Structures are given as structure tokens and as C-alpha cells.
Amino acid sequence: MSLKKARTVAYACSYVPVEVIMAAGLTPERLIPQGRCSKAEGFVHPNTCFYVKSLLSDAMAGAFADMDAVILANSCDAMRRLYDLWGAYVKSPTALFMDIPKKKDQDSIGFFTAELGRISADLSMIPDGQRVTKERLETAIKQMNDLRNQCNDLFMIMRSKPGCLTGSECFALLQDGPDSDLRGFSQKATTILKRESMNTSTKNGPRIIITGNMVNKPDLISMIENAGGRVVGIDTCFGRKNYDLKVAEGMSDPLAAIAARYLLRPSCPRMIGIKDQIQDLTNQITDTKSDGVIVSKIKFCDNLSYNIPVFQEAVVAAGARCLVLENDYEWSDIEKVRIKVEAFIEMLG
């Protein structure tokens, strides 16, 4: 008897609540484009974010055709344009659009709650999709909160016992897509947590936080560690920001609880509130006792570009050093990056 393939709904931004996808009986999967963005060059402005161009290029090449739907959001103007282009030039999968507020006040939470209700109805119309109920939402919330607990335990081990869990190993776990395979990730995390209780090894070297845009390849972390550094924080939408803060359980309106969690979690530069973002980064430097912060900035990401000068000042004020690495998402200039990273680690050492 053949096994029926689980229906998959992809998403391109960590502000898309995976609990809603799970409650519809579907499997969430983060879109991580891998191809070069040359195929998309003729359809977008040259100064468009390389992550968005890579997404469009892979989609036009059919890399996501086996998925049942994709949720795109107004994370930034480039992502909004991606939704327009997707409808015109990508045959499959169908794209759903999610409007995400930029503020965190009660009006924004109320608006986002209504938006999640609309998306829930759209997801239930996908073949094999189920009606999103309170009970199904509560189950999904519990599952994701358990995942967040495990991820935060792993982050704690990474910063305190790198001999047990290095930054490269932690990144590899996150890259596997924990929310797409909850059981498999839980088994791997449990193995590491048991190993941690028996491992007392330590490793000296400059302590580094990686922040900024999404880092999709392990090369940056590997070169930091090969140069003698210790990655003690992966502070991106692929790392801590995506797993910090749990959804309140047992609430009368689970959708409102989900909306609040996603808007109130540690934010990326697309959100209003740079003072909160600076305070969060400063707290991370203090909590991890970091010596340096490496900011990964994808070319033409306007939101992060505006904030970087203020971030640099905040890092120095917190007693650390800052290195900004602009990249084309593919890290095609990786050897130039290696020279900068090695010099940075040497300076900190």
C-alpha cells in the first residue's frame, strides 16, 4: 500500500505563524532558495534584495512545484513585489498573501488576528486541508512551544558548552527545518541534551554573535570556528528570533494569542521600534558575554541598511566589536569574507 504524501505549505518569512498551517492539517516548510538568481534578473530591478531574487529564480525553475501552496508576506516592499511576480510568472504552487503589521500595539494584534482567520479559511480550502478549530490550534501551539523550549535549551548549551554543541552543529539542526519534522528534531535534540549532561569540555576563543539577515549556508559559522572563534549566538530569523517567546496557552482566542506572540517576539528591522531592537541586541551581548558581533547583510536590504549604523554604535557601547558582512545571499565572494572574518577574530583574540 502506497503512503500518501503529506500536503506541504511553504512560507518565506518567520513572521508567518506555522501554528495556523499545522492546525489546517498541513505541513509547514520554510522556503530556503539555493539556486543562483540569474533567472530572475530580467524580471526585477537590479537593486532588488538578493534573497527575493533567489526565491523568484528557484520558483520560476520549478524548485517548489511539488508544494501545495506558499504563503508570502509583506515583510518588506521587495517581498510584496515578489507576490505580484509570483502570480504572473510562477505556475505552481499558488501563492497566498499575508498582511503583517509593523507595529506591536493592540490595534495591530487585533488586525493580525483577523488576518490569521482569513488565512486559516484559505488553508482549509487546500486539498486535504482541514477546518482550523480552537482544539487544533491549541494542539499546534503546544507542539510549537515544546519545540521552542528545546531550541532554547540548545541555544543555552551552544553558548555555555561549545564542546558539546558547536555553532556549526546547532546551525545544521536548524537548517533541517525543525517545524517540518517535529518528531525527528525532538529526537536529535534529546540526544544532544543527554550528551550535554555528561560533557564538561570547554573551548576558549573570542565569543561571537551572528545577527542580521538570514544566513542560509554554514560557511560563515565554519570559518569563524576554524579561525578560533566560538559562535555563542545565532540571532537571526533562522535562529533565536524565530524560537524566542512562546504562545500563551489556554487562551479563549488562540488566534489572538498566536498573533500577539509573533508581533511581540524579538523583532527584525522590518518592524517599527529600533530602540527595542537595540536593547535586545545589547541584552544578547551581555547574556552571552560576547566579544564580537558579526552582522550578515544581504545586498539591497533597505530595512537593515538603515539600522546598521545604530547597531554598530550599540555594539561598541556594550563593550564588543562589530563586523558587517554584505553578501549576495549565495556568498559568492566567500574567500573575501574569510579574510575579513579571520582578521576580525585575530583582532578580538
Regions found by a protein language model. Name each.
Residues 308-349:
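Peripheral docking tails and interdomain loops at the edges
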Residues 44-61, 269-283:
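Glycine-rich, highly charged phosphate/nucleotide-binding loops
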Residues 54-125:
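Acidic/His-rich segments in extracytoplasmic proteins that coordinate ligands and/or metal ions
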Residues 2, 10-11, 38-41, 49-57:
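Metallocofactor- and cofactor-centric catalytic cores in central/energy metabolism, strongly enriched
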